[in-house]
Amino acid sequence: MKKKAIVSVISVICVIAVAVGIFAGCSSKKSDSNTSNSAQKGAITVISREEGSGTRDAFTELMGIMDDSGNDATAQSAEITNSTSVMMSTVQGNKNAIGYVSLGSLSDSVKALKLDGAEASVETIKNGSYKLQRPFNIAYIDGSLSKEAQDFIKFITSKEGEAIITKEGYIGIDATESYTASKMSGTVTLAGSTSVAPVMNVLADEYKKLNPGMKIEIQESGSSAGIESAMQGAVNIAMSSRELKNNEAAKLKSQKIALDGIAVIVNKENKL
């Protein structure tokens, strides 16, 4: 747990409360009437991801938002969104909102806050000054991958794959081998993180240009759901924006494909 980062986020929330003249804690009401009243009074609206989201799991762990038993202690009254895109649009549409998203998905529709004076960027993640960072992983049943799935993974972890990952705003692995098109035909199925999905879609598109006979099916279901699907053999590959838990790692092999930051975001009208 990074204590300085925790203090920074708490300070950010307190500054927002002071700016609007009301200290409302870190929660909001879900009902339309209460949400409306909160907006009029300037209360903070905390936006969180759903249970099972890898981004939520990583955020709560890194920020120490856990109870004494180590369980997620996200406020029950926080508004829940089920994807990165919904989180962005929700914060964009509510000038009192505060939330968090994958750095690679960050756009100018919202504003990212500094933590400990460091902006969320590829450079600050690389040098370690921005503490909210987590891995992007793929996971699969070792020894059970189809040749097609193995070939797609070979592309993802190649120099060509790393270049795509870097271009999309993430930090790639240190790939050592180049990819040679296999010209295979078949289907590879993936499921999981809505944070990993955008870069995975770009990787899939570039891979299919090299291998026109291949079909890559990507389902955005959340990290935990994707991992469960892979464990059950329902998909070839899981996408996860968190590390695998012990029970998951006992059944699946995981590979890091990138490093990503988590940006704390507010509405662009916010003065911070």
Positions of predicted regions on the chain:
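Sec-dependent bacterial lipoprotein signal peptides
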Residues: 1-24
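Exported/periplasmic ABC-transporter solute-binding proteins
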Residues: 8, 21-22, 26-272
